[in-house]
Amino acid sequence: MLKKIVTALGMSGMLLASSNAIAEDTTTKNDNLSPQSVDLSPLRNLNKLDSPMDKDYNYHQAFKKLDTEQLKKDMQDLLTQSQDWWPADFGNYGPFFIRLSWHDAGTYRIYDGRGGANRGQQRFSPLNSWPDNVNLDKARQLLWPIKQKYGDAVSWSDLIVLAGTVSLESMGMKPIGFAFGREDDWQGDDTNWGLSPEEIMSSNVRDGKLAPAYAATQMGLIYVNPEGPDGKPDIKGAASEIRQAFRAMGMTDKETVALIAGGHTFGKTHGAVPEDKVKQAIGPAPDKAPIEQQGLGWHNSYGTGNGDDTMGSGLEGSWTSTPTFWNHDFLHNLYNLDWKKTLSPAGAHQWTPTNAKPENMVPDAHKPGVKHKPIMFTTDLALKEDDGFNKYTQEFYNNPEEFKEEFAKAWFKLTHRDMGPKSRYIGPWIPEQNFIWQDPVPAADYKQVSTQDIAQLEQDIINSGLTNQQLIKTAWDSASTYRKTDYRGGSNGARIALAPEKDWQMNEPAKLEVVLTKLKEIQTNFNNSKTDGTKVSLADLIVLGGNVGVEQAAKQAGYNIQMPFVPGRTDATQAQTDIESFNYLKTKSDGFINYTDGSVSADKLPQTLVEKASMLDLNIPEMTVLVGGMRALDVNYDNSQEGVLTTTPGQLNNSFFVNLLDMSTQWKKSDKKDGEYIGIDRKTGKQKWTASPVDLIFGSNSELKAVAQVYAENGNEQKFVNDFAKAWHKVMMLGRFDVQQ
C-alpha cells in the first residue's frame, strides 16, 4: 500500500542520481560506458566550488564562538512552540525532530561509508524528496530561525542531529553525549541508492537477500517498508529485511531492537487522508513542487492539510499512551496486547489490539479528550516473533534501565557512525567512553621522534635489506584503506599488521609478513635504545619506510627529494579492531597497483580506479601522477608487469607516460588473458609491453590524456617527481585528524 500511496503522490517517476559506489555490481550510471568515456566526476570537488563560504572559512574555528548552552535552550524552547502552519503533534515537535535526525543519519551504509548525517545531504535532492522523508521539509523549516540566529557557527548537519538528541533529553531519555563537527555540503551527491534508481519504491531485494552495497530494502526508504516486504504484511519476511538492512549500516540485533523499540516510544505516524482521496489531495515532493511553495512539498488539500489531516507514510496512529515521554510502554504493548491486522484510513497495512484497555488508549494528537487504539507496524511485530529479536525485546521488557542504556548507546552510534574517529569530534558534550565502531587508536604516551631520530630510523630502514618496492607497497597498502566517505581507514593504527588486513589477498600476506617483521625489529631496537621516553610506532615506521623507498627511487633516477614526514601515528590493538567491520574496507580492485580480485569485469576497472581515487580524496592530476609513478616504481600486485612501461623499473621517473604516448607502439587486446593488452612495436611486430585497461585509460580518455601529456613533456620531469611526492604525502596523511593540515 505504501508503494501505491507513493505512486499516487506522483513520485514514482522521480529520477535519482546514479552510482558513485565502489562495488562494481551496483554501478548504474556507467554501466553502458566504454573505458574511454570513464566518468571522472567523482574526482571533481564541486561542493567546494559551489560553497558560498569564504575561502578561509573554517567550521572548527567558527564553532568556537557558538554558545552551545544557549543553542540547546533555544532548541528546547522550540519543541513546544507549535506553529499554525504546521502544528506540533501532542503540542511537542520532539518526536518530529527525532524522526528528522534518524532519517538523516539512517542512510549510512557500512559497505562504502556513504550516506549518514555528516554534510547534511537530507537538504538536497534526492533525499529531500524520498517518500520515507515525507514532511521532513517542514521539520527543517522549523529549525531555520535557530540556524539563522547562529549562522556559520553551527552547520545544518550538526543542527539536524542535535535537534533529535535534544528532543530525546527533553522527553526523559538522557543521551550519552553529542559531538559537533559535521560540515555541510552544498549540493546533492551522486550516490547510487537502489538497483532501479529510476523507480521510487522499487525493491533492492533479490531472492530474499538485500543486494550488496545497499542499506534499504526499497528505493526511497531509509531501512524497510513498515507494512512488510514490498508492502505485504509478512512478519517473518519483515524480520529478515530488518536484520539485513540494519546490518548493512553496521548495527547488531541488539542495537536494532533498541533503536526501533526506543524510537517508536515517541510520536505517531500519519495516514489520515482516505485512500480514494490521496491521489487528488497530495501534491508532489519538494523537488517537483511548484515554485511558489518555496521548497516545501507534499502539499495536502484534504481538510486542514495538517494536524489531524496530515498525510505521511499512510500508516496512522501512535504506539503508546505517552507519545512524548520515554518509557517502555512500546514493549509492554507489544507483549501484552493481541494484535489484529487492519488498514489505516489511507489503506496501509497496520495492526491494532483486540483487547485494548482504557489505560492502553492513546490520546489524539490535536483533539483533547479524544482517544484511539494504539497501533503496531508489521515490522514492530517482527521484534516479537523473530527468535533473534525476541531475545532482546524480552530482555529490555524485563530490564527497563538496560533498555534505556542500550538505546542511548545505539542512538549515539546511529548519529555519529559516519563522523569517523573521535579525534574529529568537537564541542563540550563528547562522551569519555570509546566505542569499537569509532576505530579507536591509543593516545601516544611517549615522546615523539626528533629530526635526528628520523634520520637514524631512515638509515636503519635503508640498511635493513628491504627493497624500495617492499617498502613502498607496504606503505601504500596501509594508507590506501582510507575512505573519505566516513573517514575510516588510513595509516594511523597500523592495522595492516592486524586481522583482517594482514590476511587480505591484495596485501600479499606472506610478503607483507617479511616487511612487518623487519620493521618491528627496527622499532624494538630503536625503542629499547632510547632512555628519554622517545618511541616510534609501527604505523609511523611503515609510512617512513614508504618515504625512504620513494626517496631512494627518485635518487636512482637522478632526482634528490626529501619526503615530508609527520610522526604521531599510534598502533591499534587487535581488541580495538572490529574484524567484520574492517573487512568492508577491503576493495575489489586497486588500479594504483593493478590489483583485482576477479569480481570486477575488465571494462569496469578504469571506473573502479576512479572510485578508489575518490575515496582517497584525490583529484584528476593526483590520481594520474600516482598511477604513473607507481608503475615506474614497479610495485604492482604480485609483481605483475602490466603497465610497467619502463626500461628502468624501480626508478621514479615519467617513463610510464612517455612510453604510453609513444606512437611507435600499437596496442592490441591479448588473445590469452581477458583484460590484458599487448604493446607491439609497429616496425618489428615484436611485443614491447603489456598493460591493463587502467593503464591504457590514460591514453584513451581525452581528459586523462591531457594530463598524461603534461607529465610526458620535455622539461616536466622534475615536476612529475615533485607532484608524485606531494600526492604520495597526501595519501600517507589521510586520516591524520590528530594534526592540523
From Swiss-Prot:
GO terms for biological process: cellular response to hydrogen peroxide; hydrogen peroxide catabolic process. Homodimer or homotetramer. One of its GO terms (molecular function) is catalase activity. Belongs to the peroxidase family. Peroxidase/catalase subfamily. Residues 1-23 form the signal peptide. PROSITE patterns: PEROXIDASE_1 (PS00435), PEROXIDASE_2 (PS00436), PEROXIDASE_4 (PS50873). This is Catalase-peroxidase. It comes from Francisella tularensis subsp. tularensis (strain SCHU S4 / Schu 4). One of its GO terms (cellular component) is cytosol.
